[in-house]
Regions:
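Short, aromatic/His-centered strand-loop micro-motif at the edge of beta-sheets
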Residues: 108-132
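Localized edge beta-strand/strand-to-loop motifs within extracellular or lumenal beta-rich domains
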Residues: 126-147
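Flexible glycan-contacting loops in extracellular carbohydrate-active proteins
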Residues: 152-192
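Juxtamembrane/start-of-transmembrane alpha-helix segments at the extracytoplasmic/lumenal side
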Residues: 192-205
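Secretory/extracellular carbohydrate-interaction modules
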Residues: 21-109
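Hydrophobic secretory-pathway targeting helix
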Residues: 1-25
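Surface-exposed loop/edge segments in extracytoplasmic proteins
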Residues: 86-90, 113-116, 148-154
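C-terminal membrane-anchoring or membrane-association module
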Residues: 211-224
């Protein structure tokens, strides 16, 4: 019930911002539906797919993971690649039930390389719950909400322009399929906030969702 209220709150807030999209030339938008079978590969065999637009300055990625996992060790991992620096990427990983592990990693070529910034071995995300949101600006860095709360705040990744993505889900090539059905949808919006103040709205909203869920949880505990 708590998560449903958060989703309703999110929907009511986001609709006015996007309603102005057709008349707003400063917005760049990508909506991507990824076939579930694309996750049944190891990372080295994943295909890098270019986005329709290069997202710069200020962007937000909303991830709706409605995949049905095929085994407890299966994962759904998405990497976002930088336009300016080869092999620089952000990684979001979502594990299967019952653990629902979750992690965020960054790969910076040369030094320091691949670094896991935060990880949750249990209850890291909620299948069927609120979406996962990545929000970035050149000045504020990267903030991630796992659908329950903010789990990474203002990480300095220098400039990061989204140009492409890849997905994978198997740890080893001999492992069984990670995913057997379902949907994985990403909505990406970007632009320059100095030209369009409405672009600040999704980032403020992402923080509000985490706060709302926390307040509702505390209220529920006190009333029970």
């Amino acid at each position: 019930m708590i998560l449903k209220l958060a989703v309703i709150f999110f929907s009511l807030g986001i609709i006015p911002a996007f309603a102005q999209e057709p008349s707003n030339p400063t917005l760049e938008i990508d909506s991507i539906s990824i076939p579930h079978a694309d996750f049944n590969v190891v990372s080295r065999d994943s295909k890098i797919v270019p986005l329709n637009e290069i997202h710069v300055v200020s962007w937000q990625v909303t991830i709706h993971n409605e995949l049905m996992y095929a085994n407890p060790n299966g994962n759904a991992v998405v990497r976002f690649y930088d336009y300016n620096i080869e092999d620089k990427f952000l990684e979001i990983g979502m594990g299967s039930k019952p653990d629902n592990k979750f992690w965020i990693a960054v790969n910076l070529p040369d030094d320091p390389g691949y670094v896991v910034m935060t990880t949750y071995d249990e209850r890291g995300w909620v299948p069927g719950g609120a979406p996962i949101i990545l929000a970035y600006t050149d000045r504020a860095g990267l903030t991630v909400n796992n659908g329950q709360r903010i789990v990474l705040s203002n990480l300095d990744v220098e400039t990061f322009a989204l140009k492409s993505y890849s997905v994978w889900g198997k740890e080893g090539s001999q492992d069984p399929p990670a995913i057997h059905s379902g949907m994985f949808v990403m909505d990406i919006i970007s632009g320059n906030p100095t030209e369009n103040p409405l672009l600040f709205f999704p980032y403020v909203l992402a923080a509000c969702i985490g706060g709302l869920v926390a307040i509702l949880l505390v209220t529920k505990k006190r009333s029970s």
